[in-house]
């Protein structure tokens, strides 16, 4: 299968390698070309613009920094759906692994729907585009953290009946769920970090039409051990915000516990053994207590990324009228950490944020 991937960073690079090992042809684009070229030895094919991916690939996966990067990658002049969406006749699925606000995701889905509606009309009316004739699992020619898509996300949609007829028809290819000519956008943020991406055990929280999520599950299964359909477009991003809320609050509490242990004269490194098997035990406890009590370990994740996500949590809480006093405190800890120059450190840096203002020696 022809796959495009935008964003071969710390998470994206191992995901691409899993796709290649699964037998897919993967075309890679990145703003910094060297990061894409580093994957050539693994079998990836590098392209100069996202536009090339839309012309060659049936599915394009995004794993970029933020909503602005998603917008530029998809809707920019050289983006997937840039100057002329009709050029992307092969493209059927945009799967966004980036972590961005749910509202931005829904807006991007609606925008993509408007841009590709003309193409969808042509296909439903009998136009013979490549997107109509070549399914996601078929050989169609060339080589390498929004919403559901042209037909699925246009709101009041004159092509709904045609879509239903298409999906109701018998089709032995499980990937062929998109209506002819449409592009479906699935928001699919992930959890599991670089370790999960490397091991191929990521958890994917997906938002979009159920048929589309089911269609891309075999693809995502190359690097995910679980893909859960959370609901309509934007639901995956909302689930990711819940995930980040729990992770950051838990790690802030663990940092407080480590600090309390140290100031009380206890060897805090023994907390992993002493609390193992009890209610306080968790993957986060076992992973981060050693990182809070040792030095010289390579970071896993970046504080600045969590700051971005918790800022989104705060904005979403405001929009929905949701009281989140714990997350508000965590947000301030993250901001303080960034101001201390710890933006590239992982969340074990919470211990430094808590101890430095009190004059306690840091690690």
Ranges and model annotations:
Residues 60-77, 98-105:
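Beta-loop-alpha module in the N-terminal Rossmann-like domain of NAD(P)-dependent dehydrogenases
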Residues 233, 237, 281-343, 363:
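Interdomain hinge/lid region at the active-site interface
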Residues 1-62, 88, 92-93, 97-98, ...:
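NAD(P)+-binding Rossmann beta1-loop-alpha1 motif at the extreme N-terminus of oxidoreductases
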Residues 15-16, 35, 108, 219, ...:
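Hydrophobic residues within alpha-helices
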Residues 340-363:
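NAD(P)-dependent dehydrogenase/reductase Rossmann-like domain
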Residues 199-207, 228, 232-264, 275-287, ...:
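Active-site-proximal catalytic alpha-helix in oxidoreductases
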Residues 73, 99-131, 135, 144, ...:
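Rossmann-fold dinucleotide-binding core
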């Amino acid at each position: 299968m022809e796959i495009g991937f935008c964003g071969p960073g710390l998470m994206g690079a191992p995901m691409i390698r899993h796709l290649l090992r699964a037998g897919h042809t993967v075309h890679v684009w990145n703003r910094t070309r060297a990061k894409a070229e580093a994957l050539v030895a693994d079998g990836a094919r590098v392209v100069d613009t996202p536009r090339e991916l839309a012309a060659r690939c049936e599915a394009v996966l995004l794993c970029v920094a933020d909503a602005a990067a998603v917008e530029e990658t998809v809707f920019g002049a050289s983006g997937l759906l840039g100057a002329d969406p009709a050029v992307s006749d092969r493209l059927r699925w945009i799967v966004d692994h980036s972590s961005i606000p749910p509202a931005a995701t829904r807006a991007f889905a609606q925008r993509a729907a408007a841009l590709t509606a003309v193409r969808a009309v042509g296909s439903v009316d009998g136009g013979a585009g490549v997107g109509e004739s070549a399914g996601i699992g078929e050989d169609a020619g060339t080589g390498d953290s929004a919403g559901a898509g042209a037909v699925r996300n246009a709101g009041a949609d004159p092509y709904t009946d045609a879509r239903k007829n298409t999906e109701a028809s018998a089709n032995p290819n499980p990937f062929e769920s998109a209506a002819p000519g449409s592009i479906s956008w699935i928001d699919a943020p992930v959890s599991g970090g670089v370790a999960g991406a490397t091991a191929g055990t990521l958890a994917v929280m997906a938002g979009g039409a159920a048929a589309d999520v089911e269609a891309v599950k075999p693809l995502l299964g190359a690097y995910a051990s679980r893909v859960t359909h959370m609901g309509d477009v934007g639901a995956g991003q909302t689930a990711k915000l819940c995930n980040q809320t729990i992770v950051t609050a838990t790690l802030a509490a663990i940092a407080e516990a480590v600090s309390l242990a140290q100031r009380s004269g206890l060897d805090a490194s023994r907390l992993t053994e002493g609390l193992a098997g009890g209610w306080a035990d968790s993957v986060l406890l076992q992973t981060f207590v050693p990182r809070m009590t040792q030095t010289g370990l390579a970071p896993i994740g970046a504080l600045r990324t969590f700051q971005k996500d918790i800022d989104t949590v705060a904005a979403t809480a405001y929009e929905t009228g949701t009281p989140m006093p714990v997350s508000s405190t965590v947000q301030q800890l993250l901001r303080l950490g960034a101001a201390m120059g710890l933006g590239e450190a992982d969340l074990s840096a919470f211990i430094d944020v808590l101890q430095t203002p009190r004059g306690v020696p840091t690690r």
